[in-house]
């Protein structure tokens, strides 16, 4: 189109507030007189002008990396013809949805877990003592009771710490052969060893293979605790027992990035 360009009316534009984004939608009359539009706004985070070019056939534009805390964003629409001649600009205001905070974790120091800190509710009497979980030998193993009488799941490994912890990660390695690893875990904490609180369920992502290793994501218990249980609620193969080669627990560092409150 080479005639005089005319920008669409403000009434033709609607907006959607999305998490950390604004979606602009508009209609274009059938008799529109332009070839393309420029849609510009000033980013309040750095005061830089951002310009997007859209064709006459475009009907929507997603503006990402926006924040609700900035309130109104002012968008300037301006039509152009094929000769890059500009029509009169038009402005509309729109707001962003709230950008959720992001949380990341990094592994900290390994906690010194010794055999006397470990216990279970279902030790196999003939082999696989729980102390093997911290002996550093990948070919030894801990085993809950496979001999008769078997105890149905859930079954647990308990760690009684010598000091309080709150943000942590755990790691384990499956047995080398004849492995029966956890498929589902319930992570529980306590401060007296009698009253327990579930803080996380892990229902996917655990490994089934021989010698496979698993490192949990960071877990924030929400408060300090001195006792930890890894409660196995389901095993691969739906057995009434499980085994592991090694177990370790780490303190973890939690970082919260919340630009809406910076």
Predicted regions and their residues:
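Disordered, acidic Ser/Thr/Pro-rich linker "stalks" and the adjacent N-terminal cap
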Residues: 96-162, 175-180, 250-262
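Short beta-strand segments within Ig-like beta-sandwich modules, predominantly Fibronectin type-III
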Residues: 51-58, 206-208
